[in-house]
Curated annotation (Swiss-Prot):
Domain of life: Bacteria
Role: ATP-dependent specificity component of the Clp protease. It directs the protease to specific substrates. Can perform chaperone functions in the absence of ClpP.
Name by which UniProt lists this protein: ATP-dependent Clp protease ATP-binding subunit ClpX
Keywords: ATP-binding, Chaperone, Metal-binding, Nucleotide-binding, Zinc
Organism of origin: Salmonella typhimurium (strain LT2 / SGSC1412 / ATCC 700720)
One Gene Ontology molecular-function label: ATP hydrolysis activity
Keyword Ribonucleoprotein: no
Amino acid sequence: MTDKRKDGSGKLLYCSFCGKSQHEVRKLIAGPSVYICDECVDLCNDIIREEIKEVAPHRERSALPTPHEIRTHLDDYVIGQEQAKKVLAVAVYNHYKRLRNGDTSNGVELGKSNILLIGPTGSGKTLLAETLARLLDVPFTMADATTLTEAGYVGEDVENIIQKLLQKCDYDVQKAQRGIVYIDEIDKISRKSDNPSITRDVSGEGVQQALLKLIEGTVAAVPPQGGRKHPQQEFLQVDTSKILFICGGAFAGLDKVIANRVETGSGIGFGATVKAKSDKASEGELLSQVEPEDLIKFGLIPEFIGRLPVVATLNELSEEALIQILKEPKNALTKQYQALFNLEGVDLEFRDEALDAIARKAMARKTGARGLRSIVEAALLDTMYDLPSMEDVEKVVIDESVIAGQSKPLLIYGKPEAQASGE
């Protein structure tokens, strides 16, 4: 490579592509009887980048999985919730099929189908959304509805959700517009009462109003990377009609609202149908019968419900399902800890009785699958603290008494290397 110098013969060197001399450019790279300047290198890089961007959408077009394939992938990571998986698979497939065909099919405009997930804490709402985004290889971001407020009040603006999505894909607007946004705790922004109040409800109904346009589809103006809003700044224009919004919440108490509606038909007096306690539907069965009117009574405004036409309900996980979650998914919790111990050269074994005890403890805490990690972490804490300083440990065994806190994990030692080689 030459840097503004003549070659051995004293001749002035020129770029073979743009014809500029070595004095007009910063660097001149020499090959066998050919030269290229730094400006031409940059230009070539830009051309290649543009071509890659043009090719990428065509790859995405051919890679859209079918609802059956989406469901199968969800089965690898999420235990149970079969109906919710089916609803999600169809909704996600239709959403991305709509994007591929430019929002229309034979002149018919295709509507946007955002999704509402209703289910108790730890039932897999967030995991389902994350797994979908990973399968489709699209940007994914999560937002907490409880931190959102109307514009102009202390708290996060709803536009901040789109900024987070842009950050996940290095401010590539085209990528962001194919992304998935999961808004958690959506039930916490329900209207505080049925009667309009004199004071503004800036974190309840106010946030629902602010989210309406964003979820339905608008062009959101977002400041570019790392910039605060000021008049001289050019804003990025993001079309949210192409972004899939999934809202999730536990909706504690919604089952009672549904029960009141369902049981109203039983009547009173001599002709009333008397229901025994055993006839009462479970919470999961009631949630599966949810109607828009129930969500309105719960505190969501009709316009907001209208923007979430696809509703999927998740059941509370049983003890058997929690045991499956511990050992069956590809990234099951026991597999994660076994991989962690393998990095120390140690095998980790969970006996079946230990898995039963972990599941029972999580059921008692009513935290669903979310509480499993804290239980396992507490049981293994001392071992993970001591293990890096110990030698010749080959295996760690966890049984029921360890989970109950009655004993320490069983450590199985191998023979010291020196002794083994001597024999």
